[in-house]
From Swiss-Prot:
Statement: the UniProt record of this protein carries the keyword NAD: yes
Record-annotated KARI N-terminal Rossmann domain positions: 1-181
Active-site residues, record numbering mapped to chain: 107
Family: Belongs to the ketol-acid reductoisomerase family.
Required cofactor(s): Mg(2+)
Record keyword Lipid metabolism present: no
Record SUPFAM superfamilies: 6-phosphogluconate dehydrogenase C-terminal domain-like, NAD(P)-binding Rossmann-fold domains
Pathway assigned in UniProt: Amino-acid biosynthesis; L-isoleucine biosynthesis; L-isoleucine from 2-oxobutanoate: step 2/4; Amino-acid biosynthesis; L-valine biosynthesis; L-valine from pyruvate: step 2/4
Organism: Thermacetogenium phaeum (strain ATCC BAA-254 / DSM 26808 / PB)
Record's protein name: Ketol-acid reductoisomerase (NAD(+))
Domain KARI C-terminal knotted: 182-327
Domain of life: Bacteria
Binding, substrate: 251
Keyword set, alphabetical order: Amino-acid biosynthesis, Branched-chain amino acid biosynthesis, Magnesium, Metal-binding, NAD, Oxidoreductase
Length: 332
């Protein structure tokens, strides 16, 4: 594994170049401000009069349309949602590419699954922070950084890796360390983690536990505390020191239950299903399914989302969180 740090990156590779950050959302606001504070010339783009456009103005940027930003920039970072990138590229970016420009991504979906196929005379690389935008910004302001991934898909200039590392340094990532990967590896592992563990896996586990207790006659409020609320306490321990630290920190009773019962939940059948999910990602089955779902107006996505929002755990959770003044209400 190759890891790059500050001493491996040189901001001079960005001298005389303009970086366009298209999409002033979570990552966009952080990366653009960090680059600017590192002395890089930055322009930002979003939808005129949108909330993001106004936020960019509040941050002392003069936002442009995507077409204008792509025309002006030498390095173009695309930070709009995956499902919108291909159309944005076709309509606003591709017409403004010229030999020697560079395209940057923070997720490899559209390049890996060939929804975006750049011409051969541009550089294509990835800088992917492993943390949300607000953390990328806060760590930079505190003189630290968020670990990130770097990958080069196309090296027309012969300097794509140096450009990528300079970009990573500009957002503060090389302070923490930047791990070299590929678009394929980043895309497939990211999707698998979301589907099998971080989002799909954990939500189904939480809800299955909640339903089991409620169906057995226990109060929904107690089930919520035991299966969802306390999840943060455990995840924080794992996040800070790994599984071993979590096990060291919990009671012996809890650890014994973990060691003897956990494998009855995640069985060999579960592991086989995980392999199937990974294969669907590797073969492009999931990507085609998701792209088609967007093309026809997201009927399955919207129906499933409505159904999930009406689950008992949501209404119980909303009521209980109202008892917790330390929780800030998030606007979704």
């Amino acid at each position: 594994m190759k890891i790059y740090y500050d001493q491996d990156a040189d901001l001079q590779y960005l001298d005389g170049k303009t970086v366009a950050v298209i999409g002033y959302g979570s990552q966009g606001h952080a990366q653009s401000q960090n680059l600017r504070d590192s002395g890089v010339k930055v322009v930002v783009a979003d939808i005129p009069s949108s909330e993001n456009w106004k936020k960019a103005e509040e941050a002392q940027f003069q936002p442009l349309t995507a077409d204008e930003a792509a025309r002006e920039a030498d390095i173009i970072q695309i930070l709009v949602p995956d499902e919108k990138q291909a159309a944005l590229y076709r309509e606003s970016i591709a017409p403004n590419l010229r030999p020697g420009k560079a395209l940057v991504f923070s997720h490899g979906f559209n390049i890996h699954f060939k929804q975006i196929v750049p011409p051969p005379d541009v550089d294509v690389f990835m800088v992917a922070p492993k943390g949300p935008g607000h953390l990328v910004r806060r760590m930079y302001e505190e003189g630290a950084g968020v670990p990130s991934l770097v990958a080069v898909e196309q090296d027309y200039s012969g300097q794509a890796l140096n450009l990528a590392l300079a970009y990573a340094k500009g957002i503060g990532a090389t302070r923490a360390g930047v791990i070299q990967t590929t678009f394929k590896e980043e895309t497939e592992t990211d999707l698998f983690g979301e589907q099998a563990v971080l989002c799909g896996g954990i939500t189904e586990l939480i809800r299955a536990g909640f339903d089991t207790l409620v169906d057995a006659g226990y109060q929904p409020e107690i089930a919520y505390f035991e299966c969802l609320h306390e999840m943060k306490l455990i995840v924080d321990l794992i996040y800070e020191g790994g599984i071993s630290t979590m096990r060291y920190s919990i009671s012996d009773t809890a650890e014994y239950g973990d060691l003897t019962r956990g494998k009855r939940i995640i069985t060999e059948a579960t592991r086989e299903e995980m392999k199937k999910i990974l294969k669907e990602i590797q073969d492009g089955v999931f990507a085609r399914e998701w792209l088609l779902e967007n093309q026809v107006g997201r009927p399955v996505y919207n129906a499933l989302r409505r159904k999930e929002q009406n689950h008992l755990i949501e209404t119980v959770g909303a009521r209980l969180r109202g008892m917790m003044p330390w929780l800030k209400k998030k606007v979704i």
